[in-house]
């Protein structure tokens, strides 16, 4: 089990409050298996994995926002495709 210090993660995000929000959001993604971890899991809990990813600069709010926008566009495109298939019948 890896130890994580929040100081490195705070430096990447800017302040402790934003770090808490970012880490919680990322941990939720990991816990619900919405996204795969970007660092080895090493039997760690999602909160620790999220902090390690933030500390390494792999995750921040901008990255997560971009991923969510991409997912929303993909979902919208697949729904439009399904509707077009149904309307062609």
From Swiss-Prot:
One of its GO terms (biological process) is DNA-templated transcription. It catalyses: RNA(n) + a ribonucleoside 5'-triphosphate = RNA(n+1) + diphosphate. The keyword Lipoprotein does not apply. Its EC number is 2.7.7.6. InterPro entries: DNA-dir_RNA_pol_omega, Pol_omega/Rpo6/RPB6, RPB6/omega-like_sf. Pfam families: RNA_pol_Rpb6. One of its GO terms (cellular component) is DNA-directed RNA polymerase complex. GO terms for molecular function: DNA binding; DNA-directed RNA polymerase activity. It comes from the Bacteria. It is an enzyme of class 2 (transferase). Keywords: DNA-directed RNA polymerase, Nucleotidyltransferase, Transcription, Transferase. The RNAP catalytic core consists of 2 alpha, 1 beta, 1 beta' and 1 omega subunit. When a sigma factor is associated with the core the holoenzyme is formed, which can initiate transcription. Belongs to the RNA polymerase subunit omega family. Promotes RNA polymerase assembly. Latches the N- and C-terminal regions of the beta' subunit thereby facilitating its interaction with the beta and alpha subunits. This is DNA-directed RNA polymerase subunit omega. It comes from Pasteurella multocida (strain Pm70). The lineage of its organism: Bacteria, Pseudomonadati, Pseudomonadota, Gammaproteobacteria, Pasteurellales.
């Amino acid at each position: 089990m890896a130890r994580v210090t929040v100081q490195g993660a705070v430096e990447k995000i800017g302040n402790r409050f934003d770090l808490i929000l970012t880490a919680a959001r990322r941990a939720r993604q990991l816990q619900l298996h919405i996204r795969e971890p970007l660092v080895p899991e090493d039997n760690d809990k999602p909160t620790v994995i999220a902090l390690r990813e933030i500390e390494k600069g792999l995750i921040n709010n901008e990255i997560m926002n971009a991923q969510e926008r991409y997912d929303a566009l993909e979902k919208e495109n697949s729904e439009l495709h399904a509707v077009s298939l149904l309307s062609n019948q």
